Amino acid sequence: MKGTFIFFADGFEEVEAIATLDILRRGGVDVKSVSIYDNSLVEGAHGQQLITDLCWEGLEEIISTEASPSDYMIFPGGMPGAKNLAEFGPLMALLKAHWAAGGGVAAICASPAVVLASLGDTFAGLEMTCYDGFEATLQAAGIKHKEAGSVVDGRLVTGRGPGYATEFALSILAQIKDRDTAAAVSAGFTPR
């Protein structure tokens, strides 16, 4: 799948989703937000509504089977958002194909365990972090848990939760662009 896309389902964690979208755009990434529904309106876990760039039908029209390590599929956490993503079969099939084609994947909070670990041994042997309480789900799928704010393992980036959303997004930006771009965006958040 060519490009960078962040996927939204009702119940998404607002801080994780919006911080990631914003930081990637500040870094010059042409990231598109995608609703898994047939309309672009999604509602977060705390009632915030968002209109995505694309709905699922619009994404289907532009999907490519090619992928490179700088093409990312991104999954915010939140419940029941992560569960809703994991239960949407066409998205899970696309994720599996994207990973197999060499594309990058990023997930934060509950999504490493609920979305990624749901694909069986697809991510077995890799190192991830997740929201507290989901560690056993990772380990049951053969995934190595690491307690950290953000973990990068090759073309896989995971984040622990909303308190680490900025670190997570900057890690993705460093993978897609480079560390200098991520550092420049990060520097813009700190007063001199």
Task: Give each language-model segment a name.
Residues 1-101, 113-118, 124, 137-147, ...:
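Extended, subdomain-level signal for the structured scaffold at the beginning of enzyme domains
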Residues 33-35, 105-109, 126-131:
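Short, hydrophobic beta-strand segments that form beta-sheet elements in well-ordered domains
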Residues 152:
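Cytochrome P450 catalytic-domain "roof"
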